[in-house]
Amino acid sequence: PIRRIWEDGIFQVGSQFSHTWKFSDINYQVASLEDKKVMFLDYSELLNSLDAGSIAKITVNNRTLNRANFEQSVLMPMRGDARDKYRKEYNGVILGKATAGNGIVQEKYLTVTVPKKNIEEARAYFTRVGAGLAVHFAALGSKCVELDATERLRILHDFYRQGEEVDFHFDARDMMRKGHDFRDYICPDYIERHSDYLILGGKYCRTLYLKDYANYIRDSFVCELTGLNRNMMLSIDIIPIPMDEAVREVENRLLGVETNITNWQRRQNANNNFSAVIPYDMEQQRKESKEFLDDLTTRDQRMMQGVLTMVLCAGSKEQLDADTDQILSLSRQKMCQMAVLKYQQTDGLNTVLPIGTRKINAFRTLTTESLAVFMPFKVQEIQDKGGIYFGENAISHNLILCNRENLLNQSSFILGVPGSGKSFSAKELIAFLILNTEDDILICDPEGEFAPMVQAMGSDIGTVVHVAAGGRDRLNAMYMVEGYGENNPIVVKSQFIMSLVERIDPKGVGAKQKSIIDRCTGDLYEEAEQNSTVPTLAALREKLMEQPEAEARE
């Protein structure tokens, strides 16, 4: 259905133009009830902001974690030194944890389709829409970024050619120079159509849609549908209705219900039945119509038409049937009915994919609140490139890989009850930094529990210093690093030495004694600079003993 593409990510679909934004997940499922209410209202505001002249599509894409890309971005590279054995062991632990998890990466997109006369008008419209979406997603705590043509085509390529993700390559200029079609880069080798499933290059796919809605749907419905550990894609098509048209439609329906009730009462009166009670179904229609009109006119709700579709992918027909039964069973548990599209699998697939088309017309009229129940947010994933392993996500069971270099403040505390693993976490972090970075690491270890780890890493990069009374290591109070004291380091060091002597001598240091210490300190550093040596407190004592004043030897 895609006719033309532009490098900035705009697709021409039929006579319309579409653009896609990718938004990050937020911690909705693990939030408190109060926080969920705030997020729900913010998401409702986002839905209300959708333009009535456009069609929006919210897509949740479950794709298998690409092992090659994962290893390249997460695992430690070997460096050919004695510590490679520890790197191999660390990589083995990470791969084991990744295999034990669900191995599914969930991505979320918002696609907007709008009819415009030309690409210039469409580009201006999408620029305005993108700015508004960024504000609303920021209020939710989510990040929204627009996708260019390469990124949008990569989504389609990874879906059509599962298992060949690393082979994707698209260069628009090279394509035009060679006269190739962009479809050649993403389409499967063949498509085999059946009444209730498709075969895309050896992979079995089946498209379903939400046929019947429950009276009450929990906000975890979409998350539970997409929680299956399989490649799948779920989309919610949203068609906002203009407010004046929506109010007029509901008023006409309410007028029709009132007319039916009046006609029924007239017939009862003609039969001399003046005490007849209005039938329950008519009373319910009147009540629901009034509530709907109330939502539109007093509660800032909007009328929207929505359709939920999803496509399942599997390696075999048997696995596809089993996954389909699981989805159908899950929807029945929620008092909803998912159904398989018959002889509409291709139309359903084009509806699910985030390209901006809609071929399935199984609409349900909803208010903003009713549509917001299909909450796409689940839990935030932290998988930074080059990140440190901090554990597993309690909801998705995926790895938590955080690169603190990306944070505004890289400082951290390790807090926990006794026995919860604080020391182990610190050792794990230090070991990662030693093995994978060139960082300088200083460890203050009063308990002496980190020394074996430093010694195991090798004496060429680590040293254990024992600072204690009677110990073999000393701290040189006279040592100065480059840049010490800024303008006059000797004066600053002299003041430090005098304060040190004052702490040692309980009687205090007089003015003449301070003058002697100041003079000796300057002379000592001058001699050390000439001899290329480092002064010590012992050298300062010898210098003081050489002075003619009696106070110098006190």
Positions of PLM-derived features:
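A glycine-rich phosphate-binding loop feature that marks nucleotide/adenosyl-phosphate handling sites
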Residues: 62-63, 149-155, 342-352, 451-453, ...
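Pre-P-loop entry segment of helicase/translocase ATPase cores
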Residues: 365-394
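Extended, folded cores of ATP/NTP-driven motor/assembly subunits in large transport
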Residues: 1-376
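Non-catalytic, charge-rich alpha-helical accessory subdomains
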Residues: 281, 285-293, 301-302, 318-322, ...
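Switch/coupling segment of Walker-type NTPase motor domains
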Residues: 27, 34, 59-73, 84, ...
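Hydrophobic alpha-helical scaffolding
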Residues: 119, 123, 279-282, 313, ...
